């Protein structure tokens, strides 16, 4: 009954009901690791593709990701409008002690199990259930059967897509939307994130990756015109999180210096957020030893701050470690996640990372939109990753499922909307009546 009531109240208390618009086609671009200041006013001067989208569309000040500010949790938050503790995708690495199964950033076979994905229904599954057609390119999870459904087409992620892969995906997506083979096309591109990790968020390599994306966007605008899609297609671009500098030389917290690793049943992830499962009888000892460690905070599950919307997740560990910005947690220096490169030397050290407190400035992402349903040359106030789902549902013309997003934060972006206030919710009498009918 409690779960049923939560689902009901989520729908009526945390999201608003409005009539779906007459749907147009929708192209969604997820640009991983794209920090909000990468397209500051100064940066836009040398980014003609992004500049044209901003001048002809909507740009929010920044997008605050869900906690933890990692990829998989926010992939699902963006596509469900729900916090991590609701949709259950709480990390890039997860462990289920009941089944002894692991989710390891989507690369191991067990990551494809419905166990991890069926906690909520993402937009592409809702559209498929409504007999819409969905084409997805390199999108993490598009290869998974979720709630018994798969997208119309999935070009599965195998390795980091190249700039040519990205350009080809955009071109093919536009062809699919034009021909009627697709109603929604969604493309994932990772190179900005990869270069930010390897070389740092301010590095020339990361800036080169951004310029390559900008070139594709410039072509995309022309391709939309060439296909006559200007009045039939909305395009939404967003990122999952930002990126900050890390310094492995002097900002690493080695757990082996404070506890015996033999006292841990399981450790998941390294970096800003690390999950620990102590062996039976060792929880209190490990907790008290780690409480004194500087530059990080150790939380027992029930004491995780409510503002993270994290602790109710069923895969959350008994102990969660959260590092201060720029610090990195690992079992030892030997276990740091070096990246493979041609030298095999210290150039393999990572220079950038994310996953920290989601309210930190460097964790902020982007949101841009352009098309017939969006205002032109409009700057919007900051939004949160849970808000993106509602705007996608609206322009796709489908009623959103119950979610944690705020309609009032996004309605201002739409043409013909003069007020930022959400539609009027059901009055209290009607709500009581529905509750009686629903639960009696």
From Swiss-Prot:
Active-site residues, as the UniProt record annotates them? 71
* Lipid-linked residues (GPI-anchor amidated serine): 419
Cite the Pfam families for this sequence.
Phosphodiest
Subcellular localization(s) per the UniProt record: Cell membrane
What the entry lists under SUPFAM superfamilies is as follows: Alkaline phosphatase-like (SSF53649)
Q: Which keywords fit this entry according to its UniProt record?
A: Cell membrane, Disulfide bond, Glycoprotein, GPI-anchor, Hydrolase, Lipid degradation, Lipid metabolism, Lipoprotein, Membrane, Metal-binding, Phosphoprotein, Signal, Zinc
Q: Which residues bind substrate?
A: 32, 71, 92, 193, 241, 354
**Bilayer topology term:** Lipid-anchor; GPI-anchor
The biological process GO terms on file are: choline metabolic process; lipid catabolic process; lipid metabolic process
Q: Which residues form the propeptide?
A: 420-440
Quote the disruption phenotype from the UniProt entry: Enpp6 knockout mice give birth according to the Mendelian rule and are apparently normal. Mice exhibit mild symptoms of fatty liver and are more susceptible to a choline-deficient diet and exhibit severe fatty liver phenotypes at the early stage.
Q: Span of the secretion signal?
A: 1-22
Name of the protein in question: Glycerophosphocholine cholinephosphodiesterase ENPP6
This protein's species is: Mus musculus
